[in-house]
């Protein structure tokens, strides 16, 4: 079977169109406008870019969307007080904290301060537990996006061999928990390989995968001969490997060597 490139932009556009209809219906039938606040601490260029993109999409979908920018030297206590304000705000249904936070702030303490019912990144321990037992309302965005790509571009993963390369709290672990659920769009046979897995075993597992999800954080780590013919490969990695002499822009590559 010839390799087929999944065009994520097309899938994203389709999802945005579906969400816009849902938001319009929510407003018309229930007179409710989804409210989202994104809290940005400092001026990290990558974080600013991410938050700007989130705000743009939120406004396009018709959300009541707030971008709350705070100085990098904000105290932990002040940030916790700000979160509590939005926890109590009935117009806000979702709270996003853009990571990373400055070193003087305990990220876990901040994330755990968010009302679990407004924790749309699903980082709160309550939501992590809900994901594990399959009663979740929210999923972390990257694993959820991977699941959408698989179902829309590859097909039902039920019974398929899924290999997740990486065990981060943001991608790897929740990805495993999502794909093993006995529900539509999951119900797969899942293996997780990571830094504790010998490389020869990593290669062995990858070659067996019907669906390979790579979130290793290592540029061009997975090689073409690690992937069996017809397998679906989702490359989560975004790695900066230098600067282009022609454009002066960063050169970004994934965790899979597609060349």
PLM region spans:
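Glycine-rich phosphate/diphosphate-binding loop of Rossmann-like nucleotide-binding domains
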Residues: 41-55, 137-228, 232, 241-244, ...
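Glycine-rich, N-terminal phosphate-binding loop of Rossmann-like dinucleotide-binding domains
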Residues: 99, 216, 236-237
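Short beta-strand elements in bilobed, periplasmic/extracellular small-molecule ligand-binding domains
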Residues: 36, 58-72, 186-193
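Positively charged, low-complexity intrinsically disordered leader regions
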Residues: 1-31
């Amino acid at each position: 079977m010839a390799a087929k490139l999944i065009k994520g932009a097309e899938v994203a556009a389709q999802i945005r169109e579906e969400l816009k209809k849902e938001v319009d219906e929510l407003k018309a039938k229930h007179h409710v406008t989804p409210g989202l606040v994104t809290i940005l601490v400092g001026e990290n260029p990558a974080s600013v870019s991410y938050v700007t993109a989130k705000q743009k999409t939120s406004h396009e979908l018709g959300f009541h969307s707030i971008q709350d920018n705070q100085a990098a030297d904000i105290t932990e206590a002040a940030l916790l007080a700000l979160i509590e304000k939005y926890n109590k705000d009935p117009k806000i249904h979702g709270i996003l904290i853009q990571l990373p936070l400055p070193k003087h702030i305990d990220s876990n303490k901040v994330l755990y301060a968010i009302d679990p019912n407004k924790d749309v990144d699903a980082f709160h321990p309550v939501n992590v537990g809900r994901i594990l037992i399959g009663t979740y309302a929210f999923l972390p965005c990257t694993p959820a996006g991977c699941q959408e790509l698989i179902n829309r571009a590859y097909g039902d993963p039920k019974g398929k061999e899924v290999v997740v390369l990486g065990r981060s709290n943001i991608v790897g672990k929740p990805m495993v928990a999502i794909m093993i659920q006995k529900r539509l769009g999951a119900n797969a046979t899942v293996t997780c390989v990571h830094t504790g897995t010998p490389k020869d075993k990593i290669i062995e597992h990858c070659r067996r995968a019907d669906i390979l999800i790579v979130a290793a954080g290592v540029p061009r780590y997975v090689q073409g001969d690690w992937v069996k013919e017809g397998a679906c490969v989702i490359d989560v990695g975004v790695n900066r490997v230098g600067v282009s002499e022609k454009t002066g822009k960063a050169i970004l590559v994934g965790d899979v060597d597609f060349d």
